[in-house]
Amino acid sequence: MLFRSTTMYEYGHVKEFNIRSWRAFDASPLVDAETDTLIWPGENGLLYTIKLNTSYDKAAGTLSINPDKPVFTRYMTDLNTDPKNDLGMENSPIIVENYLYVGDNRGTYFCVDLNTMELIWAQEIKDDQNATAVFEWGEDGQGYLYLGTSMEHSDGSCYMYKLNAVTGEIVWETEWTDIVYNKNVSGGVLSTPLLGKKGTNFEGMIFFHVAKSPSEYEGVLMALDTDTGEVIWQKNMKYCWSSPVAVYNEEGKGYMIICDSVGNMHLIDGKTGGILDTVGLGSNIEASPVVFNNMIVVGTRGQKVYGIKIS
């Protein structure tokens, strides 16, 4: 328990069924409150579901769980039949209604029906995916996914996509070349893209950051057109893993906050890519910032948490 710093529950590694031996979790789990079920993709290639049997007494201030034995499965398709493939899942899943969306290390993005655990579709995206995708309901009532790949297996390129969430079909693909390969720290899209909010001046734009391009310690921030995938603007900066966030004023004018690997927090005009202000926080910022009202909060590799006020 948090207030006692004791372990409430622990589950061991599955050795016989997993596709990959690596037993870590990079993805963040999701909990379905209605069914009291935790859903968690693993780097060993297994998708876990765990009934938590949660008991919460608000008046007494008590919380307990008594998890059932985890139920897990794995997925193989014609796109990833090579036994040498590292079919782990490092990006966090998206769940919309009863459908889960997630990608694996070898360039497959797929959709699972959580009611049946059936694989609905799988789409090749050419490389590893570390960053969580973004879901959008389109003006046509259709669901769409925006996602990007890291540069782990491809030759100097990463890819940004818009997918049809029902069929998995590619609406557009934008390739970004000139990425430096580093076997210890991959380049490409390593942060979740930022989708512009409807009814604001960011509408129709999706913002990606590509790390290690055009050199080892640089990156490129760019805005793409959500309909076509065409680059609206691009800006060179230090590379980052931190995901950008947006803040909007009452008139619907948007501003972007993005943090980089040398400790800078930038306030950016999302329509042009121009830097409006920069605050130095002293060390690498790998975490993504959160915004509450006019306060930005973020942690750094320097073991400090900062609150930055927007004025």
Language model segments and positions:
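Short loop/turn segments that connect beta-strands within beta-propeller blades
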Residues: 5-9, 52-55, 113-117, 164-167, ...
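Blade-level signature of beta-propeller repeat domains, shared across WD40, Kelch, NHL, RCC1
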Residues: 280-311
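Extracytoplasmic beta-rich repeat domains
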Residues: 8-31, 60-95, 122-141, 148-153, ...
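Short glycine/acidic-enriched loop and turn motifs that connect beta-strands
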Residues: 44-47, 108, 150-155, 200, ...
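Short coil/turn segments that connect the beta-strands within blades of beta-propeller domains
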Residues: 34-36, 97-98, 142-143, 203-204, ...
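Short, small-residue-biased leader/transition segments that mark boundaries at the very start
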Residues: 1-2
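Residue position within the beta-strands of beta-propeller blades
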Residues: 40, 102, 147, 207-208, ...
